[in-house]
Design a protein with these regions (language model features):
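Extracytoplasmic metal-acquisition and chelation regions
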Residues: 2-10, 17-174
């Protein structure tokens, strides 16, 4: 178990270091390039772990910018409008994504809210934000920082891979 957790943590570190080093996604026989837009660079990195270079991946919040204080712009709504899948954490972390989806005229089924996609069947137990020791009390209820736990990050990677494979079965062989 420890070895597996270390491996996942190492993969996350490598993906963060390699951000931007991959090649562009290519169109496939059954459709154009699949565009995945993540709310943060962290979730974009997890998406790269999940799907490699099979899809085009970008993030809304630039690296180094705090998701808690980020203010989306009209250009972000335009980026959402052209995305096939929007990957967010949910659980109140990137609460602005709902308004951005509406502004872009995007349906809710284009959103994969990772934290809300996990449940007991995944072996995940949510921590109360107060019990977790989350600094500042910025979140009500559940602690949304699931990806900080290697098991949580691995579950996020699995959820992203499963969703892209379901959306585009032609890409599943490349994932």
């Amino acid at each position: 178990m420890r070895r597996r957790i270390r491996s996942i943590a190492a993969l996350i570190c490598i993906s963060v270091a390699a951000t931007g080093c991959g090649s562009a996604a290519e169109p496939t026989a059954s459709g154009g390039t699949y565009r995945l837009l993540a709310t943060t660079s962290v979730f974009a990195d997890l998406a790269r772990l999940a799907v490699g270079d099979a899809v085009q991946i970008e993030s809304i919040v630039p690296a180094g910018v705090d998701v808690h204080t980020f203010e989306p712009s009209p250009s972000d709504a335009a980026r959402i409008a052209s995305a096939d899948l929007i990957v967010a954490n949910g659980l109140g972390l990137d609460a602005w994504i709902g308004k951005l989806l509406n502004a872009a005229g995007k349906r809710g089924d284009a959103l994969l809210s990772l934290g809300e996609a996990l449940d007991a069947s995944d072996g995940w137990i949510y921590l109360d934000a107060d019990a977790s020791g989350a600094a500042g009390g910025a979140h009500d209820g559940v602690d949304p920082h699931i990806w900080l736990d290697p098991k949580g990050a691995a579950l996020y990677v699995q959820k992203i891979a499963a969703r892209v494979s379901a959306d585009r079965p032609d890409l599943a062989v490349r994932i």
